[in-house]
Regions:
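Hydrophobic packing residues within well-ordered alpha-helices of enzyme cores
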Residues: 5-9, 57
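A conserved acidic beta->alpha catalytic loop
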Residues: 1-6, 47
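Hydrophobic residues within well-ordered alpha-helices
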Residues: 9, 61, 141-143
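Catalytic donor-sugar/metal-binding loop of nucleotide-sugar-dependent glycosyltransferases
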Residues: 104-105, 126-129, 138-156
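Acceptor/aglycone-binding surface of glycosyltransferases and processive sugar-polymer synthases
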Residues: 19-34, 39-42, 51-131, 157-175
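Short, structured coil segments at secondary-structure junctions
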Residues: 12-13
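Terminal low-complexity segments of carbohydrate-biosynthetic enzymes
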Residues: 173-193
Length: 193
């Protein structure tokens, strides 16, 4: 599918960036590292994100001086056509753990529809190469005392591609990452990100 993606976008005015390693988190890290603009946005190519929400997100960053804006499928007047019962329950549990362990005030920890200040994202020293990136990013952002907010978002049914998340395998990786970060920054007391 990588070749199909490259073929589909090669006629557009965009840079194609190749990963050094493999994995969802590695792709997002590599993307953030190469951004040269003031703001960046993680935006899935499967058609599930609503581009109409981008203007609202950028206005939150510029006018309200937030460092990051997280979209959420679990605010009022929003939802998802792509969520399953298992992913909904898993996300609820991980979001709850984010609140308990780190006082993280977002309602959809696994939804990586995020816009933010590039300079702030580059300070986070992100390391996850897999789907645990979804929790590492907001947790390190919170631990770094950056200013953030959530907005309501509606996730549409994907237009193309297959869901690559394995709810149980990736759920275990995500839980392991949360425990690791909790032990490192809250129990052992390493304050440096």
């Amino acid at each position: 599918s990588d070749e199909l993606t490259i073929e589909a976008i090669k006629n557009y005015d965009c840079n194609i960036i190749y990963q050094d390693s493999r994995g969802y988190g590695d792709a997002l890290k590599k993307g953030i590292e190469t951004v040269e603009t003031e703001f960046f946005c993680i935006f899935n190519a499967d058609g599930s994100f609503d581009p109409k929400e981008l203007n609202f997100m950028i206005n939150k960053l510029k006018n309200d001086k937030y460092d990051f804006v997280f979209a959420s499928r679990y605010e009022k007047n929003c939802g998802s056509d792509d969520d399953t019962f298992v992913t909904f329950i898993g996300n609820y549990i991980f979001t709850y753990l984010g609140k308990i362990f780190f006082n993280l005030k977002i309602s959809d920890i696994l939804y990586t529809y995020v816009m933010g200040r590039t300079s702030c994202a580059k300070k986070l020293e992100l390391a996850s190469k897999d789907f645990s990136f979804c929790v590492e990013f907001p947790i390190k952002m919170k631990l770094s005392r950056m200013k953030y907010t959530s907005i309501a978002s509606y996730e549409k049914k994907r237009l193309g591609g297959k869901k690559k998340v394995n709810a149980f395998k990736d759920g275990f990786l995500i839980l392991s990452e949360m425990i690791k970060l909790f032990l490192r920054y809250k129990i052992i007391g390493n304050s440096k990100i």
